[in-house]
Each structure stands twice: as structure tokens, then as C-alpha cells.
Regions:
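C-terminal peripheral helix-coil segments that are non-catalytic and often amphipathic
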Residues: 1-4, 139, 143-151, 176, ...
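Helix-turn-helix
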Residues: 21, 29-63, 67
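Short, structured helix-loop boundary elements
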Residues: 12, 19-20, 40, 62, ...
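Short coil/turn segments at alpha/beta junctions that flank glycine-rich nucleotide-binding fingerprints
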Residues: 32-36, 110, 151
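Hydrophobic alpha-helical connector segments
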Residues: 67, 81-109, 167
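Generic hydrophobic, amphipathic alpha-helix propensity
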Residues: 18-26, 43, 68-72, 76, ...
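Amphipathic alpha-helical segments used for helix-helix packing
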Residues: 106-126, 142, 176-180, 214
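Amphipathic alpha-helical packing segments from all-alpha helical-bundle domains
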Residues: 77, 105-106, 125-153, 161-176, ...
Length: 242
């Protein structure tokens, strides 16, 4: 009697569905218990599969943690690229506004997991997400910034990595500050003004100046003052978090 053939496509879909269930359960357990406190048996229970099945996908808990981290950052990259693709205008500052709003919201909604991933990066190189995945994510900003320079909207002498650090660094600390107010008695800080201020900062410092491609001393003074204020806010927030 002939054996009924298994549709390879159906089998692949089942395997992918099972892997997604493992990764979703693993992320929840890692956030709740941290990497060291997480147990593979608990992940298996939440994914409704046997513990041995997890090891057929991932050789160790560390490998599973890496897969969760990579899935997360790769997903963010795809979403950020989709935000850029859906932003109809080509104007740099409008697109920067859209990317800033997306990134700030992601930081707040996923605060627990992002904090875990940064802690692992500092303390556990075995399960730290690779720089390649982070580079792919921030490359969305890099392409936007370089295109702004090509279009003549931004200064030609602007340093990309400095602009990138200001953009993501400011949003990171603002996101933490906003997230800290979610369960507090006082009103939660609004997201939109934060992004508006960052866009205004980029406009005042990085905006192209007709005929020079540079900027005057007053613009540098304004940027210096704004960065000093940002530094003070970061110091205050760091003290609150410590």
C-alpha cells in the first residue's frame, strides 16, 4: 500500500509556525525572568510543545536567546523600512519626523525587552546581538541622512555618525523617561513634542545654508546649548534609574 505523500509546503509552514511559537514564548520568559533565570522547560510549556522539541531547533538556551534578539531587531528593520516606504514626501525633515515617531514608540512599547538586550550586550557577550543586526537597523537613518545631503537639504560637511548618535541617543533617553511615567501618578509625557524638538535640532544645526554648505557660529552656539540641556536631562534620568 502506497504511503500518502506529505506536501513539503505544508510541512514547512508547520515548522515555521512552531518556531514562531517557540520564539514568542521565549521572549516572554526572558523578559520576565532575565536570561539567567529563564528555564527552557517554562518556554516549552508556554509554547505548548515538548522541551526536547526546542532543542531540535536550538542547541542551547544561549542560541535561543540569540534567535529571539535577531528576530526582534530584524523585525524592527523591516518595519522602519516600511515606514520610510509609506512616507509619500521626499523631504528629509518629514521623513525624519516619521522615523523618529516610529523609533520612539518602539522604545516605549518594547522597553522591557530592549533594556534586556542592552543589558546582555554589556554583561554577556555570549548572547549579545551581533553588530550586523544593529547596523542594519540604524542604516535606515544613515540612508535617509545621506539622501538629505544629496538633495541639498543638509550640510555637506555634517558627520554622519555624530548625527546618528544624536538622533538615536536622544530618542533612547526620552523613551526611557516617558516609559518611567506610564505607571506614575503624574501625567505621562507626550511623544510628539520630543520628536518635534529633535527635528528642530537637526534643522537648525544640519540644515544646508545657501552658498556655503556650512553653518554660522550662532547655530553652533544654539546646538551647544541644546546639547547641554540634553546632557543635563540624561544625567538626571541616569540618577533616577540607578
Amino acid at each position: 500500500m502506497a504511503t500518502k505523500a506529505v506536501n513539503p509546503e505544508t510541512q514547512r509552514v508547520k515548522l515555521e509556525r512552531k518556531e514562531r511559537a517557540i520564539l514568542d514564548a521565549a521572549r516572554a520568559v526572558f523578559v520576565e525572568h532575565g536570561f539567567d533565570g529563564a528555564r527552557v522547560s517554562e518556554i516549552a510549556r508556554r509554547a505548548h510543545i515538548g522541551e526536547g522539541t526546542i532543542y531540535s531547533y536550538y542547541e542551547s538556551k544561549a542560541e535561543l536567546m540569540l534567535a529571539v534578539l535577531q528576530q526582534f531587531w530584524d523585525g524592527l528593520t523591516r518595519e522602519a523600512e516600511a515606514v520610510m516606504a509609506s512616507t509619500r514626501t521626499e523631504r528629509f525633515y518629514d521623513r525624519l519626523q516619521a522615523l523618529g515617531q516610529y523609533h520612539l514608540n518602539i522604545l516605549i512599547v518594547n522597553a522591557d525587552f530592549i533594556n534586556l538586550s542592552f543589558a546582555l550586550r554589556r554583561n554577556n557577550s555570549e548572547v549579545s546581538v551581533s553588530r550586523d543586526h544593529l547596523r542594519q537597523y540604524v542604516a535606515v537613518f544613515d540612508r535617509l541622512f545621506l539622501r538629505g545631503q544629496d538633495r541639498g537639504e543638509l550640510r555637506r560637511d555634517a558627520v554622519l555618525w555624530q548625527a546618528r548618535d544624536i538622533f538615536y541617543g536622544s530618542l533612547e533617553y526620552s523613551g526611557r523617561s516617558i516609559e518611567m511615567t506610564l505607571d506614575a501618578d503624574h501625567k505621562m509625557r507626550e511623544q510628539e513634542p520630543v520628536v518635534d524638538q529633535i527635528v528642530a535640532l537637526f534643522r537648525s544645526h544640519y540644515g544646508a545654508v545657501d552658498g556655503s554648505g556650512g553653518t554660522d557660529s550662532s547655530t553652533f552656539d544654539q546646538l551647544s546649548q541644546k546639547l547641554d540641556l540634553l546632557s543635563d536631562k540624561i544625567d538626571t534620568l541616569s540618577n533616577q534609574l540607578s
